């Protein structure tokens, strides 16, 4: 569980917090195996015996004062009696995790019988859009073949297709059999019969270890639905060709109800991989894609505002059904046409899944993403709870979870991998703030309760017999991290303790929220105003602006680069980069609304360092493929020219670019050889990433370098009005300086 705060020394009261101009909060990556310093938890069992405070329900931890019979809660100060079993346990503190570490992970007893525990097999279902092209199906097949290699023995796999009909595959016999049920074309009607009546669920879900070859054979039989079949299926004459026929909404609704019948019996979590080649345009949940088009210019509608909200609550409601059925949906959209991910995204993010967007089948990383996603551990049925000491409390929470309807500051996460990150901001409980004199310090406690599927121990794949293949066990665990923070006695101490990457994380969450509610322009304005106010507060705090005749002097005195405070120095550059990011660029600059939604979903789950890389890419230079020249350059053409290095490596999180300058010595091998330092760096980056970044090699002077040059944002105008020499970031700072002057008058 990695936790990072915007400031490691908290403001003493609300006045100090407001005067700093900084967001106050933290990010947490609950299922990360280690903390932010690379240290793992102290592990143990009997999590249900961990003492809890009678007043605030916080868990006992190393910061609590303990005597023989009682303990003081480190969060609220309440004196709690110790039960007799705890007194006996704590007499030998060295063997007890909660006595030795403030970061613990304890096993919990499971509800239900031992039999139910061992029958919970991992279930995976691939739902494939066959109202698509051959290329789309070939890509999907290769992705699923990769997925089959990553699935653990004992897993069950189902294959379903959708178009104007739903196709269920039985792959447990000698040849694959498909049974179809037609989807009513209108947006109101449900299927004429339940999928369970078409094919019993346990006939549909096949054991992977015995049916892998037959699943692969079934995938090879997939063909795109023809326009003739669509028109015939829709009951139309042969001469009328019905375009469309992608009954995604009806298919998903039927599939969740189908799987839900065995939730808690055959499986504890079913993961559905939905492959979509375009917008749903048939049956329930069909989407009107005409809202994306030229008419926005003539209707004077703000496209940046109009295309961000969902046009129907259907998929949000469907996500609720998925959760109730124990289903988590990962949505893979492979399309360059407008698909309205603004409406579809809820199906994945609210059911605990991920949203992937690939604009073409040619260079798609879909197979690698599938394999990577299934190969990493995940927790499910998770509950996340943040508690604080009494002087302050959590304000807003951000991330892909849904709040508990009954309890405050309790979030449910359906499925959580080791990368998923959530954020909170804080506010003071009253005007008192923290005590300036007592030794008590602010405390934050994060509790994360989760379930994992543990495969049978000591059995290799080849040893798996049919009798043992189902013996996966569920394990319920409780992970707790308790942290104590210092308080800042003045604004310098706040500024000296800033973590700019976490500040960026909270800013990104807030501007995404603002742009969803009020449009991209409002999100940009919020960010701009924030930087102006922060710069003004900083100049005021350090007394950098002199007063003459009662008025503040010229803006030339204003320090807009935070030269007195190294921790704040990166922020203007990060804000500029965020304003240049497709997340906040204008529709008329050619930012596809689906790509914007994809970035919102991706950036909402990234840890602070990854997000920093996505907003302001890392650019380093090499003098040879084996020699690093400089570890960090600014994103400007000037930096390239002045460095004199022949090779540059740019890491933009989703894209990696190796650029050879036009003046590079022809004897330097291109592309870089596999055993060189640069390749090792690339491979390490790819290995540690949650998604598969696209790798591009470019030779300056020979290849089209546009994709690389687009990342050199510092000469670009912040509002996207083209390029100008010596403008961009410099003129942005001038503008901020003028606004700060006006603000401080």
Swiss-Prot record:
Subcellular localization(s) per the UniProt record: Cytoplasmic vesicle, COPII-coated vesicle membrane; Endoplasmic reticulum membrane; Membrane
GO cellular component, one term: endoplasmic reticulum membrane
Keyword Transmembrane helix found: no
Positions bound to Zn(2+): 53, 56, 73, 76
Keywords, ordered alphabetically: Cytoplasmic vesicle, Endoplasmic reticulum, Membrane, Metal-binding, Protein transport, Transport, Zinc
Gene Ontology terms, MF aspect: zinc ion binding
Region (Zinc finger-like): 53-76
Mode of membrane association: Peripheral membrane protein
Traits of the deletion mutant: Despite normal fertility, impaired pollen coat exine pattern formation with reduced sporopollenin levels. Plants lacking both SEC23A and SEC23D are semi-sterile and exhibit developmental defects in pollen (especially at the late uninucleate stage) and tapetal cells, including defective exine and intine, as well as signs of cell degeneration and structural abnormalities in organelles of the male gametophytes.
Distribution of this protein across tissues and organs: Mostly expressed in closed floral bud, pollen and flowers, and, to a lower extent, in mature siliques, roots and leaf primordia.
Pfam (any one): Sec23_helical
InterPro entries, A to Z: Sec23/24_helical_dom, Sec23/24_helical_dom_sf, Sec23/24_trunk_dom, SEC23_SEC24_subfamily, vWFA_dom_sf, Znf_Sec23_Sec24, Znf_Sec23_Sec24_sf
Family, per entry: Belongs to the SEC23/SEC24 family. SEC24 subfamily.
UniProt subunit comment: Component of the coat protein complex II (COPII), composed of at least five proteins: the Sec23/24 complex, the Sec13/31 complex and Sar1.
Cited function: Component of the coat protein complex II (COPII) which promotes the formation of transport vesicles from the endoplasmic reticulum (ER). The coat has two main functions, the physical deformation of the endoplasmic reticulum membrane into vesicles and the selection of cargo molecules. May contribute to COPII-coated vesicles formation and ER-Golgi vesicle transport. Together with SEC23A, essential for pollen wall development and exine patterning, probably by regulating endoplasmic reticulum (ER) export of lipids and proteins (e.g. sporopollenin) necessary for pollen wall formation.
Protein's name according to its UniProt entry: Protein transport protein SEC23 D
Source organism of the structure: Arabidopsis thaliana (Mouse-ear cress)
Gene label: SEC23D
């Amino acid at each position: 569980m990695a936790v990072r705060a915007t400031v490691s020394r908290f403001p003493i009261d609300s006045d100090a917090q407001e005067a700093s101009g900084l967001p106050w909060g933290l990010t947490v990556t609950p299922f990360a195996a280690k903390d932010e310093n690379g240290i793992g938890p102290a592990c143990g069992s009997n999590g249900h015996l961990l003492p809890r405070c009678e007043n605030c329900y916080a868990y006992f931890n190393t910061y609590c004062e303990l005597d023989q019979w009682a303990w003081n809660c480190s969060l609220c100060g309440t004196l709690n009696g110790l039960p007799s079993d705890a007194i006996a346990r704590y007499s030998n503190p060295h063997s007890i995790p909660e006595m030795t570490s403030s970061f613990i992970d304890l096993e919990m007893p499971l509800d239900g019988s031992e039999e139910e525990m061992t029958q919970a097999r991992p279930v995976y279902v691939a739902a494939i859009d066959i109202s698509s092209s051959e290329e789309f199906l070939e890509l999907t097949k290769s992705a699923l073949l990769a997925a089959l290699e990553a699935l653990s023995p004992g897993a069950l796999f189902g294959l379903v297709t959708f178009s104007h009909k739903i196709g269920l595959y039985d792959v447990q016999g000698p040849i694959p059999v498909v049974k179809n049920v037609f989807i009513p074309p209108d947006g109101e009607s449900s299927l004429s019969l339940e999928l369970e009546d078409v094919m019993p669920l346990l006939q549909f879900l096949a054991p992977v270890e015995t049916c892998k070859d037959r699943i692969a054979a079934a995938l090879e039989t997939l063909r795109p639905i023809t326009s003739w079949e669509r028109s015939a299926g829709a009951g139309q004459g042969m001469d009328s060709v019905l375009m469309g026929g992608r009954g995604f909404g009806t298919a998903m609704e039927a599939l969740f109800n189908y799987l839900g019948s065995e939730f808690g019996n055959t499986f504890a979590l079913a993961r559905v991989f939905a492959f979509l080649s375009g917008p749903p345009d048939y049956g329930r949940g069909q989407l009107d894609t005409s809202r994306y088009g030229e008419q926005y210019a003539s209707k004077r509608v703000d496209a940046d505002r109009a295309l961000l909200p969902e046009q129907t609550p259907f998929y949000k409601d469907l996500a609720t059904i998925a959760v109730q059925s124990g289903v988590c949906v990962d949505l893979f959209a492979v399309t360059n046409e407008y698909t309205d991910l603004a409406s579809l995204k809820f199906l994945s993010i609210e059911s605990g899944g991920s949203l992937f967007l690939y604009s073409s089948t040619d260079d798609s990383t879909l197979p690698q993403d599938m394999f990577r996603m299934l190969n990493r551990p995940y927790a499910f049925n998770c509950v996340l709870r943040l508690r604080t000491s009494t002087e302050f409390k959590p304000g807003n929470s951000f991330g892909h979870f849904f709040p508990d309807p009954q309890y405050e500051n309790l979030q449910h996460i359906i499925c959580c991998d080791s990368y998923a990150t959530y954020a909170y901001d804080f506010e003071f409980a009253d005007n008192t703030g923290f005590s300036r004199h007592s030794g008590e310090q602010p405390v934050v406690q994060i509790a994360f309760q989760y379930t994992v599927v543990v495969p049978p121990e000591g059995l290799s794949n080849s040893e798996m017999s049919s009798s043992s293949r189902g013996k996966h066990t569920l394990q319920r665990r409780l992970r707790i991290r308790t942290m104590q923070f210092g308080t800042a006695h003045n604004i310098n101490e706040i500024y000296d303790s800033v973590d700019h990457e976490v500040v960026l994380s909270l800013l990104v969450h807030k501007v995404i929220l603002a742009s969803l509610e009020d449009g991209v322009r409002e999100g940009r304005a919020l960010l701009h105003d924030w930087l102006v106010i922060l710069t003004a507060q900083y100049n005021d705090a350090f007394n950098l602006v002199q007063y003459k005749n009662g008025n503040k002097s010229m803006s030339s005195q204003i320090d807009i680069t935070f030269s007195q405070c190294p921790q704040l120095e990166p922020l203007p550059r990060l804000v500029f980069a965020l304003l240049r990011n497709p997340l906040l660029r204008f529709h008329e600059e050619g930012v596809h609304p689906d790509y914007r939604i994809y970035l919102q979903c991706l950036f909402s789950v990234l840890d602070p360092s990854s997000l920093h890389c996505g907003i302001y890419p890392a650019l380093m230079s090499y003098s040879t493929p084996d020699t690093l020249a400089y570890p960090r350059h600014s994103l400007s053409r000037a930096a390239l020219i002045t460095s004199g290095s022949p090779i540059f490596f740019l890491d933009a999180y989703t894209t990696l670019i190796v650029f050879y300058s036009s003046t590079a010595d022809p004897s330097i091998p291109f592309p870089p050889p596999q055993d060189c330092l640069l390749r090792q760096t690339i491979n390490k980056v790819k290995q540690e990433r949650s998604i598969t970044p696209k790798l591009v090699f470019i030779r300056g002077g020979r290849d089209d370098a546009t994709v690389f040059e687009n990342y050199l944002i510092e000469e670009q105008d912040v509002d996207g009005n083209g390029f100008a020499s010596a403008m961009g970031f410099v003129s942005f700072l001038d503008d901020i300086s003028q606004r700060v002057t006006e603000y401080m008058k």
